[in-house]
């Protein structure tokens, strides 16, 4: 499918790992979203620090990824955007209820933020709010829960550019 769409101006997101992710990078996905363990595993290393995540995310960009969004469990998330700029955001304050769907919610929020504002820092914060709101809910989060976390849950974090 990606081969057929390549070169037609279609932007796509890949939330996959290992060889599957490596094999689609040549089609220049708009966004890939590994977690920090998956990112390290792809290169046979451990990625824990900001510098390590930036280094290996940029390697994914050299291979074709435009934006690399790395979820980091309790440490929040980092984004290396298509301009090569690194951003990070912590998690919102709340109680973990359910981790199922958090990554998918983060991706959806990030894409929505990019479409809405075209601003990577905003998209990272919205994606993180969606992922956190889902984590704090027994099911997928509601729009009101997401808005509340976006506005108050990060203690005024906007996403820090590194």
What are these regions (language model features)?
Residues 3-8, 22-23, 50-162:
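Conserved phosphate-binding/catalytic region of the ribokinase-like
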Residues 1-51:
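Conserved beta-alpha-beta core of the PfkB/ribokinase-like small-molecule kinase fold
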């Amino acid at each position: 499918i990606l081969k057929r769409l390549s070169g037609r101006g279609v932007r796509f997101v890949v939330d996959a790992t290992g060889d599957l992710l490596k094999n689609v990078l040549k089609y220049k996905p708009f966004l890939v979203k590994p977690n920090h363990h998956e990112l390290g595993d792809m290169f046979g290393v451990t990625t824990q620090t900001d510098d390590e995540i930036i280094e290996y995310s940029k390697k994914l960009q050299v291979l074709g990824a435009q934006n690399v969004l790395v979820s980091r469990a309790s440490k929040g998330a980092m984004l290396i955007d298509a301009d090569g700029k690194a951003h990070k955001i912590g998690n919102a304050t709340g109680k973990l209820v359910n981790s199922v769907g958090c990554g998918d919610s983060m991706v959806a929020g990030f894409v929505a933020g990019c479409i809405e504002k075209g601003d990577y820092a905003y998209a990272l914060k919205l994606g993180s709010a969606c992922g956190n709101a889902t984590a704090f809910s027994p099911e997928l989060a509601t729009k009101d829960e997401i808005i509340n976390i976006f506005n108050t849950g990060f203690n005024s974090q906007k996403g820090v550019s590194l």
